[in-house]
Amino acid sequence: MSRRHGIWLTLFVLGLLIGCTNTKEAEKRAEVQKLQARAAYDRALSYLNDKQPAGALASLQEAINVNPESALYRDTLGVVLLELGRPDMALDHFKKAVELNPLYADAHFHMGTALAESRRWNEAVASYRKALELPTLTIPETANQNLGLALYHLKQYREAEQTLRFAISLDPKMQTAYYNLGLVFVAENRRDEAKAAFRQARQLAPDSPVGQAALDRLKALGEGG
Protein backbone atom coordinates (compact mmCIF):
# COMPACT_ATOMS: atom_id res chain seq x y z
CA MET A 1 0.00 0.00 0.00
CA SER A 2 1.36 3.38 -0.97
CA ARG A 3 1.93 6.05 1.61
CA ARG A 4 -0.77 8.23 0.03
CA HIS A 5 -3.30 5.42 0.17
CA GLY A 6 -2.35 4.81 3.78
CA ILE A 7 -2.99 8.44 4.67
CA TRP A 8 -6.39 8.43 2.99
CA LEU A 9 -7.34 5.21 4.76
CA THR A 10 -6.31 6.70 8.10
CA LEU A 11 -8.34 9.82 7.44
CA PHE A 12 -11.33 7.71 6.42
CA VAL A 13 -11.17 5.68 9.61
CA LEU A 14 -10.80 8.83 11.69
CA GLY A 15 -13.85 10.29 9.95
CA LEU A 16 -15.88 7.20 10.80
CA LEU A 17 -14.77 7.34 14.43
CA ILE A 18 -15.62 11.03 14.71
CA GLY A 19 -18.98 10.41 13.06
CA CYS A 20 -19.79 7.59 15.47
CA THR A 21 -18.74 9.74 18.43
CA ASN A 22 -20.90 12.64 17.25
CA THR A 23 -23.86 10.31 16.75
CA LYS A 24 -23.48 8.85 20.23
CA GLU A 25 -23.18 12.31 21.75
CA ALA A 26 -26.30 13.46 19.91
CA GLU A 27 -28.19 10.39 21.10
CA LYS A 28 -27.01 11.02 24.65
CA ARG A 29 -28.13 14.67 24.49
CA ALA A 30 -31.51 13.61 23.13
CA GLU A 31 -31.94 11.09 25.95
CA VAL A 32 -30.99 13.69 28.57
CA GLN A 33 -33.50 16.13 27.07
CA LYS A 34 -36.25 13.50 27.21
CA LEU A 35 -35.47 12.90 30.87
CA GLN A 36 -35.51 16.64 31.57
CA ALA A 37 -38.85 17.00 29.80
CA ARG A 38 -40.29 14.05 31.71
CA ALA A 39 -39.11 15.53 35.01
CA ALA A 40 -40.84 18.82 34.15
CA TYR A 41 -44.01 16.90 33.22
CA ASP A 42 -43.95 14.99 36.51
CA ARG A 43 -43.59 18.30 38.37
CA ALA A 44 -46.63 19.57 36.50
CA LEU A 45 -48.66 16.58 37.66
CA SER A 46 -47.58 17.25 41.24
CA TYR A 47 -48.68 20.87 40.91
CA LEU A 48 -52.03 19.72 39.55
CA ASN A 49 -52.49 17.32 42.47
CA ASP A 50 -51.80 20.26 44.80
CA LYS A 51 -54.26 22.45 42.84
CA GLN A 52 -51.55 24.86 41.71
CA PRO A 53 -52.38 25.48 38.04
CA ALA A 54 -49.83 28.26 37.58
CA GLY A 55 -46.97 25.95 38.50
CA ALA A 56 -48.43 23.21 36.32
CA LEU A 57 -48.64 25.53 33.32
CA ALA A 58 -45.03 26.65 33.73
CA SER A 59 -43.76 23.09 34.10
CA LEU A 60 -45.74 21.84 31.11
CA GLN A 61 -44.45 24.67 28.97
CA GLU A 62 -40.93 23.77 30.08
CA ALA A 63 -41.52 20.14 29.10
CA ILE A 64 -42.77 21.21 25.66
CA ASN A 65 -39.83 23.56 25.14
CA VAL A 66 -37.42 20.72 25.85
CA ASN A 67 -39.37 18.07 23.92
CA PRO A 68 -41.74 19.75 21.45
CA GLU A 69 -42.54 16.44 19.74
CA SER A 70 -44.48 14.98 22.68
CA ALA A 71 -48.21 14.76 22.00
CA LEU A 72 -48.80 13.88 25.67
CA TYR A 73 -47.31 17.13 26.95
CA ARG A 74 -49.31 19.19 24.44
CA ASP A 75 -52.53 17.42 25.33
CA THR A 76 -52.01 17.80 29.07
CA LEU A 77 -51.31 21.51 28.72
CA GLY A 78 -54.50 21.83 26.69
CA VAL A 79 -56.51 20.08 29.41
CA VAL A 80 -55.17 22.47 32.07
CA LEU A 81 -56.05 25.48 29.91
CA LEU A 82 -59.49 24.02 29.31
CA GLU A 83 -60.08 23.68 33.05
CA LEU A 84 -58.96 27.30 33.47
CA GLY A 85 -61.69 28.41 31.07
CA ARG A 86 -59.46 29.05 28.05
CA PRO A 87 -60.76 26.71 25.33
CA ASP A 88 -59.34 29.04 22.68
CA MET A 89 -55.79 28.56 23.93
CA ALA A 90 -56.36 24.88 24.71
CA LEU A 91 -57.50 24.21 21.16
CA ASP A 92 -54.11 25.12 19.71
CA HIS A 93 -52.40 22.51 21.86
CA PHE A 94 -54.96 19.80 21.10
CA LYS A 95 -54.55 20.45 17.38
CA LYS A 96 -50.80 20.11 17.73
CA ALA A 97 -51.19 16.92 19.79
CA VAL A 98 -53.29 15.17 17.13
CA GLU A 99 -50.96 16.47 14.45
CA LEU A 100 -48.05 14.83 16.26
CA ASN A 101 -50.05 11.65 16.89
CA PRO A 102 -53.22 11.25 14.78
CA LEU A 103 -54.09 8.07 16.71
CA TYR A 104 -54.17 9.85 20.09
CA ALA A 105 -57.86 9.28 20.83
CA ASP A 106 -58.05 11.23 24.10
CA ALA A 107 -56.55 14.29 22.40
CA HIS A 108 -59.29 14.13 19.74
CA PHE A 109 -61.85 13.92 22.57
CA HIS A 110 -60.32 16.88 24.39
CA MET A 111 -60.30 18.87 21.16
CA GLY A 112 -64.00 18.11 20.78
CA THR A 113 -64.60 19.41 24.29
CA ALA A 114 -62.75 22.65 23.56
CA LEU A 115 -64.77 23.10 20.36
CA ALA A 116 -68.01 22.41 22.24
CA GLU A 117 -67.14 24.98 24.89
CA SER A 118 -66.63 27.42 22.02
CA ARG A 119 -70.08 26.37 20.70
CA ARG A 120 -68.57 25.04 17.48
CA TRP A 121 -70.92 22.09 17.54
CA ASN A 122 -70.35 20.63 14.07
CA GLU A 123 -66.59 20.56 14.58
CA ALA A 124 -67.06 19.14 18.07
CA VAL A 125 -69.16 16.29 16.66
CA ALA A 126 -66.43 15.49 14.13
CA SER A 127 -63.75 15.39 16.84
CA TYR A 128 -65.84 13.23 19.18
CA ARG A 129 -66.58 10.79 16.37
CA LYS A 130 -62.90 10.60 15.47
CA ALA A 131 -62.07 9.83 19.10
CA LEU A 132 -64.72 7.11 19.23
CA GLU A 133 -63.36 5.49 16.08
CA LEU A 134 -60.01 4.87 17.76
CA PRO A 135 -59.53 1.83 20.03
CA THR A 136 -57.26 3.72 22.44
CA LEU A 137 -59.98 6.03 23.80
CA THR A 138 -59.98 5.73 27.59
CA ILE A 139 -63.37 7.32 28.30
CA PRO A 140 -65.89 6.16 25.65
CA GLU A 141 -68.84 6.75 27.98
CA THR A 142 -67.96 10.44 28.41
CA ALA A 143 -67.22 10.86 24.72
CA ASN A 144 -70.65 9.46 23.85
CA GLN A 145 -72.28 11.70 26.45
CA ASN A 146 -70.57 14.78 25.04
CA LEU A 147 -71.38 13.73 21.48
CA GLY A 148 -75.03 13.37 22.45
CA LEU A 149 -75.07 16.88 23.90
CA ALA A 150 -73.46 18.33 20.77
CA LEU A 151 -76.05 16.56 18.59
CA TYR A 152 -78.79 18.00 20.81
CA HIS A 153 -77.49 21.51 20.17
CA LEU A 154 -77.56 20.74 16.44
CA LYS A 155 -81.22 19.68 16.86
CA GLN A 156 -80.40 16.14 15.74
CA TYR A 157 -82.60 14.78 18.49
CA ARG A 158 -83.05 11.18 17.40
CA GLU A 159 -79.33 10.57 17.06
CA ALA A 160 -78.68 12.50 20.28
CA GLU A 161 -81.10 10.20 22.12
CA GLN A 162 -79.44 7.06 20.76
CA THR A 163 -75.98 8.32 21.67
CA LEU A 164 -76.97 9.34 25.19
CA ARG A 165 -78.70 6.01 25.79
CA PHE A 166 -75.53 4.26 24.71
CA ALA A 167 -73.49 6.40 27.12
CA ILE A 168 -75.86 5.37 29.91
CA SER A 169 -75.47 1.71 28.94
CA LEU A 170 -71.71 2.13 29.39
CA ASP A 171 -72.12 3.94 32.71
CA PRO A 172 -75.59 3.65 34.29
CA LYS A 173 -74.62 6.23 36.94
CA MET A 174 -73.67 8.98 34.49
CA GLN A 175 -75.82 11.81 35.84
CA THR A 176 -75.15 14.29 33.03
CA ALA A 177 -76.23 11.76 30.40
CA TYR A 178 -79.66 11.40 32.07
CA TYR A 179 -79.99 15.17 32.36
CA ASN A 180 -79.09 15.75 28.72
CA LEU A 181 -81.44 12.97 27.67
CA GLY A 182 -84.14 14.89 29.51
CA LEU A 183 -83.29 17.97 27.44
CA VAL A 184 -83.73 15.93 24.27
CA PHE A 185 -87.14 14.74 25.44
CA VAL A 186 -88.22 18.28 26.31
CA ALA A 187 -87.20 19.44 22.82
CA GLU A 188 -89.37 16.68 21.35
CA ASN A 189 -92.24 17.45 23.76
CA ARG A 190 -92.00 14.01 25.35
CA ARG A 191 -92.83 15.30 28.81
CA ASP A 192 -93.27 12.04 30.70
CA GLU A 193 -89.98 10.65 29.41
CA ALA A 194 -88.30 13.96 30.21
CA LYS A 195 -89.57 13.81 33.79
CA ALA A 196 -88.27 10.26 34.18
CA ALA A 197 -84.83 11.26 32.90
CA PHE A 198 -84.63 14.31 35.16
CA ARG A 199 -85.78 12.25 38.14
CA GLN A 200 -83.02 9.76 37.51
CA ALA A 201 -80.44 12.54 37.20
CA ARG A 202 -81.61 14.02 40.49
CA GLN A 203 -81.63 10.70 42.34
CA LEU A 204 -78.02 10.00 41.42
CA ALA A 205 -76.72 13.13 43.18
CA PRO A 206 -79.47 15.47 44.42
CA ASP A 207 -77.14 18.08 45.91
CA SER A 208 -74.85 18.38 42.90
CA PRO A 209 -75.23 21.24 40.38
CA VAL A 210 -76.71 18.80 37.87
CA GLY A 211 -79.08 17.46 40.52
CA GLN A 212 -80.27 20.99 41.30
CA ALA A 213 -80.68 21.75 37.60
CA ALA A 214 -82.74 18.57 37.22
CA LEU A 215 -84.99 19.72 40.08
CA ASP A 216 -85.53 23.06 38.32
CA ARG A 217 -86.45 21.22 35.13
CA LEU A 218 -88.90 19.02 37.01
CA LYS A 219 -90.55 22.08 38.54
CA ALA A 220 -90.84 23.64 35.09
CA LEU A 221 -92.60 20.46 33.96
CA GLY A 222 -95.06 20.73 36.84
CA GLU A 223 -93.40 18.34 39.27
CA GLY A 224 -91.73 19.19 42.54
CA GLY A 225 -89.13 16.43 42.39
Where are these regions (language model features)?
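Residue-level recognition of tetratricopeptide repeat
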Residues: 36, 70, 104, 138-140, ...
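Terminal, low-structured helical/coil segments at or just beyond the last alpha-helical repeat
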Residues: 21-34, 187-225
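Structural marker of alpha-solenoid helical repeat scaffolds
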Residues: 32, 66, 100, 134-136, ...
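TPR alpha-solenoid repeat register
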Residues: 73, 107, 141-143, 177, ...
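Canonical tetratricopeptide repeat
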Residues: 42, 76, 110, 146, ...
